[in-house]
């Protein structure tokens, strides 16, 4: 993962998201906001880093590009079991790129990459499977979901301080109503624990196609009039703000495990553009 190391080059690595081969406890996320006139250079440099990392058995991540939201924003997300795994994975990543380019060459490559960015930030999110709808039953199911995902719709909810318990209780009620109505799909929840505002929840819907959004049931149909009224009141009391973001999965900038690649090799190993 590209960890931008301040000073010489602090690169919060091309770590990242929404899952990479294991049901980890954390998501290690690097958010890159690219200069509009540098996007082509960003992609070119990133592909070099991805290839060097892949060739030398480096880290694993999935890359996502904002389709609807703040444009020219790319995130790299990796699964981590523990905080200690963050350090280990960073060392693996830096070692892989260093092996390909040498210490000086890797530093120069990272500096060029950094120069294409308007800003960047790292964020650590804890998986909240207890708040998720239709979480994967096992690692095989997890890999199947990630392999088929092409889009991710994320609802970012910022909860007022001291109201987390109320919000989480309401979210569990919504999940129960969705289960009762046999709602298709899944909603995977994570909560920011470092690098962002406390009380921030990410509710991600992983999709094979955008038309899945056309068939999503309304809150009223799931909760009923009384349940919807309760939801609206809890929402007004507990939520400070909500943001909706639609991401596109970018396979050419990703490096997912073989267990995922093997399920959709044509997608995860795209042929270079002529």
Question: Which residues does each predicted region cover?
Answer:
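Positively charged n-region of N-terminal signal peptides that target proteins for export
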Residues: 1-4
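Bacterial N-terminal signal peptides
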Residues: 7-16
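Short S/T/G/P-rich N-terminal loop/turn motif that feeds into the first structured element of a domain
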Residues: 20-229, 234-274
């Amino acid at each position: 993962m590209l960890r931008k190391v301040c000073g010489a080059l602090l690169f919060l690595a091309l770590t990242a998201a929404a899952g990479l081969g294991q049901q980890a406890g954390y998501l290690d996320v690097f958010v890159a906001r690219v200069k509009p006139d540098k996007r082509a250079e960003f992609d070119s440099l990133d592909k070099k880093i991805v290839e060097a990392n892949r060739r030398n058995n480096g880290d694993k991540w999935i890359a996502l590009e904002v389709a609807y939201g703040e444009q020219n924003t790319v995130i790299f997300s990796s699964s981590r079991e523990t905080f200690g795994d963050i350090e280990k994975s960073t060392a693996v990543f830096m070692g892989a790129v260093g092996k390909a380019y040498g210490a000086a060459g890797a530093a120069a490559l990272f500096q060029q990459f950094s120069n294409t960015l308007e800003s960047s930030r790292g964020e650590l999110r804890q998986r909240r499977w207890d708040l998720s709808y239709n979480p994967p039953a096992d690692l095989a199911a997890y890999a199947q979901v990630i392999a088929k995902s092409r889009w991710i719709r994320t609802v970012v909810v910022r909860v007022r301080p001291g109201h987390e318990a109320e919000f989480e209780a309401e979210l569990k009620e919504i999940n129960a109503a969705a289960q009762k109505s046999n709602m298709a799909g899944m909603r995977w929840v994570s909560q920011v624990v470092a690098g962002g505002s406390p009380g921030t929840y990410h509710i991600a819907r992983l999709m094979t196609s955008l038309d899945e959004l056309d068939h999503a049931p309304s809150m009223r149909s799931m909760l009923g009039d009384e349940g919807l009224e309760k939801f609206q009141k809890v929402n007004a009391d507990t939520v400070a703000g909500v943001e909706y973001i639609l991401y596109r999965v970018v396979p050419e900038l990703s490096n997912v495990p073989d267990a995922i690649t093997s399920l959709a090799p044509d997608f995860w190993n795209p042929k270079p553009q002529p």
